[in-house]
């Protein structure tokens, strides 16, 4: 298991999403809301474009930490607030940046703070994992 010091970077990664990524996630999750794959439907409800599923964004963020830790069982808590959508362009897709840093450490666990951004916009607020140590 890793040792944790407040302020240390646990992991950092950019993840590229495409419209195909959204369709694949829809199939796996069963969430076929057309705002996740049809521009016309997204526009008709006032959205700026097709949106990535919030749970996909949340899963991507946690996967960055899981890859660094190598142990999914170490994660004992995970929570986020969805603050802004990730709009996935039909041609260029969308790049989501995840930065995971140690926010706090106690005798039994470490809190990992996630900064998840799309462009200059934070898309997940209060994104934190608790990891057993």
What are these regions (language model features)?
Residues 52, 74, 108-110:
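Short loop/turn segments at connectors of secondary-structure elements within structured domains
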Residues 1-10, 90-133:
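HotDog/MaoC-like acyl-thioester-processing domains
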């Amino acid at each position: 298991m890793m040792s944790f010091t407040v302020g240390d970077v646990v992991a950092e990664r950019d993840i590229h999403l495409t419209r195909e990524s959204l369709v694949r996630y829809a199939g796996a999750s069963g969430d076929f809301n057309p705002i996740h794959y049809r521009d016309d439907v997204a526009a008709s409800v006032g959205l700026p474009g097709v949106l990535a599923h919030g749970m996909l964004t949340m899963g991507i963020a946690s996967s960055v930490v899981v890859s660094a830790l190598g142990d999914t069982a170490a994660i004992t808590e995970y929570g986020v607030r969805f603050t802004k959508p990730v709009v996935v362009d039909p041609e260029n897709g969308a790049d989501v940046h995840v930065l995971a840093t140690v926010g706090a450490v106690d005798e039994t666990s470490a809190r990992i703070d996630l900064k998840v951004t799309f462009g200059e916009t934070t898309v997940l607020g209060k994104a934190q994992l608790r990891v057993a140590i």
